Amino acid sequence: MHLNQSRFLTRSSGLIPVLLSLGILLTCSLAYGQMPSPDKVKRDFTRLLARPATALRPYFQSTKTDSVLIEKGFFYSEATEKVPVLIFKPIAAGQKKLPLVICLHGTGGNKEGMQTLLYRLAKDGFMAVAIDGRYYGDREKAVKGQNSYVEAITKAWQNPDKVHQEHPFFYDTVYDVWKLVDYLSTRPDVDPLRIGMMGISKGGIETIMAASVDSRIKVAVPMIAAQSFKWSLENERWQGRAKTIWNAHLQAAKDLGDSEVNKKNVEAFWHKLIPGITDEFDVPSMIRLFSPRPLLLLNTELDQNCPLPGAKIAFASAAKAYEADHAMDKFGFDVEPNEPHRATPRHLDMMIAWFKRWL
């Protein structure tokens, strides 16, 4: 399946998945032809993130507005790990089981920052749910003026105890999402067969990881997230992603005896904190697992965090899986021309339309 340049940079017509000609990108074939089987990827990723089960202990309070019902509360994903949750749902729903969309924020965000999107989804008939990722929002643990997320990642990097290793860079929040689905699936107002997920940037990467492995997620729309960590590292394009947590990378470079952040210490940093990210847990590998469920990948042309050549590898890998499953009608991608790393209004519209179509 050949994905040519013009296809990537041409705006999609409505929500009809892009038609792709036969073949596969040569770069994808060469770099990812020996990817582990989807079953192995799922098994290995689940094992990596496994931790002792705990009671969810959910608690919520409700507030009714003129048009939506808002619930604020929490559940526990681990014995001492409280996950704050924000839920918007249509007032008119009553006791009806609702389709659900989980919305994950990006670096520097929190669940409150997703409220406009939650409201919009609720007005369209969905229950919409956001959480604070690890060390964000109500889960910040650093003193005022510090970046709790970066501090936690730095601490995890410097942790000498391999048995008790945190993974605050993506992986721990992915585990929280799985437990969130555990909780939501028990609610009488949720249709467990109609659960979707979207995320922006960091949240989009977490969406790819969580949804690819968890078959309870029926529809997914990762935004400004499709990429290849392997390609970025090998082609010296890791800087955009690294700058989102730059101080942690600076500390890692210093700890390794380097005067600056470089490819070698970035690789060591990723290897410890997001093991497998340039191999079986890279986006082009994990994205295959979502087929044949409906998937829409939304990227921008000038995104330095998710360089387009790496994104193309992810697109091609997904397309190959969907073609093999005879499900190309359920796969779509779009690249917004001349846009940097941001969720554009047009892509937000496309995301909601995708859920309305498939969920």
Residues covered by each model-derived region:
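Primarily recognizes the serine-hydrolase "nucleophile elbow" in alpha/beta-hydrolase
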Residues: W178-T244, T278
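N-terminal cap/lid segment of alpha/beta-hydrolase-fold proteins
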Residues: A50-Q95
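Short beta-strand/loop motif that positions the catalytic acidic residue
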Residues: L297-N299
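Mobile cap/lid helix-loop segments that gate and shape the active-site cleft of serine hydrolases
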Residues: V219-M286, P307, A311-F315, E323-M328
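Cap/lid segment of the alpha/beta-hydrolase catalytic domain
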Residues: K96, T107-Y175, F229-E236
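C-terminal catalytic histidine-bearing segment of alpha/beta-hydrolase fold enzymes
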Residues: F315-L359
